[in-house]
Amino acid sequence: SAQGLANYVKSQVPKNVPLACAIAYDTRHRSVQFSRLCAEVMVAAGFKVFYLQGFRSTPELSFAVRAKHCSCGIMVTASHNPPSDNAVKAYWSTGGQLLPPHDQGVIDEVMSVDTINRTDFDQAVAERQIEFCQTEIDREFIAAVGKLATPGPRELKIVYSPLHGVGTTAVCPVLEQAGFTDVEVFALHAKPDGDFPNVPGNVSNPENPRVFDSMVEHARHVDADIAVATDPDCDRIGCSAPLTMAQDSEWDTLSGNQIGALLADHVLETRQQAGSLSAENFIVTTLVTTQLIRRIADSYGVRTIGDLLVGFKWIAGAIDEFGA
């Protein structure tokens, strides 16, 4: 896969433009080894590699591609799939995943690879063809995401679970940057572990309400206001919260559409109150998004770019086309 990506990118980038690739990995089995292998292949193909050493999130990898002006990026992960799986997510220079025609172009190159070239990882580091950039990117990523925080109460007690994934490298520092100081990492899910041992069915999908059973029990015990979880590569979120303000309230795990509707309304409301909502702003929805979000956007006079195919890459494409 790495060789095919390298071959395709080289065919698309002008000869006088330096080649660069950002690489990160999650907590799955052999993710470290696969990321090093990808780095060796990319260096041998003539790319400078910006390598995030240590478990990092998919959003941070996407950020690194743009921050380092890379030609492409590689995230070694299988998202919230079972423990037996691992794979790569490929990113274009925009920081988004591959869109047509590039996605098919890379697949065609992968299928036609007959030779895989590698440069020894340690040798490439010594020759500065691989640069460890995690400290710099961590700082810039956390600051950039923290600036997106909207006004509102910060006196919340949050129980957070990375579901044995990378989330503590992204969620916790971003929450702290945004002013949320009472955050407890749920101990049962805190350890990075590709077996996802303490998650129901060993599948770390925060959209599965069963994931929250033990979290909610603990959250109620410590009188938390909300329980939040992210998948292994930290690009998917779920949450559970009490139905009322009563101390003995039942808790409910929100669906993706419920979370999306609440976030859309909150962001639009706070931007309107700040006087920063304009006709240039828009909401993006996909084929599986509730129509409630379109109605919320309409109520604020904001257009909706809707019914995109499912996947972050299509949303990123809309941002590139219409502006953020």
What is the predicted function of each stretch?
Residues 14-85, 179-238:
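N-terminal small/polar loop signature for handling phosphorylated ligands or for N-terminal nucleophile
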